[in-house]
Amino acid sequence: MKRLEVSNQAKLPTQFGEFCIQCFREKGSNGSKDHLVIFTPNFPQNPLVRLHSECLTGDALGSQKCDCGGALQMALERISKEGGLVIYLRQEGRGIGLFNKVNAYALQDKGYDTIQANEMIGFKDDERDYSIAGEILEYYRIKKMRLLTNNPLKIAALEKYAEVTRESLIVCANEHNQGYLEVKKLKMGHLL
């Protein structure tokens, strides 16, 4: 926990059920970044875990361009029933930040896919770093988990810290995100 400062725990009643929250402040050369963990009290030894990167447009604004908001809601619903946690990482836009994400969205509006748009503004298709999630898993002493994901990069990253069994999390396509989901499957190797 050398690069993390840990907050107190607080209760968080939600539409999905009762959770607790705790913040992890990542200290680094670029200042600090706060990540949030939402968890059920007394979660099981083999908990459901959702590693979720921040998506303001999908999570808070209900954007139909992605599957993020739906995936987060589905994860919270399942976790409230089965026990576990969501590690909510502040890595907006697959790690490029909100400003750049909006610029990438503008390119998508012109017909470029999500990967092409990121590359056109100088980024890789995915700039995220999941090592901080590994440190958070170690903090909670999680050695085995059922990971709610379709992303093979998340599986590979977390297998360094715990035994991972993947459980799929499928959000229905709509007219606005169908192409995005196809790119995730065909170009990014997502297990959809």
Curated annotation (Swiss-Prot):
Which residue pairs form cystines in this protein? Answer: none
**InterPro entries according to UniProt:** GTP_cyclohydro_II, RibA, RibA-like_sf
- Binding site residues for GTP: R50, L51, H52, S53, E54, E92, G93, R94, T114, T149, K154
Q: How is the cofactor bound?
A: Binds 1 zinc ion per subunit.
Molecular function as annotated in GO: GTP binding; GTP cyclohydrolase II activity; zinc ion binding
Is the S-adenosyl-L-methionine keyword given for this protein? no
The protein's superkingdom reads Bacteria
Asked whether the keyword Nucleotide-binding is assigned, the reply is: yes
- Which HAMAP family is this protein grouped with? RibA
State the protein's name: GTP cyclohydrolase-2
Source organism of this protein record: Helicobacter pylori (strain J99 / ATCC 700824)
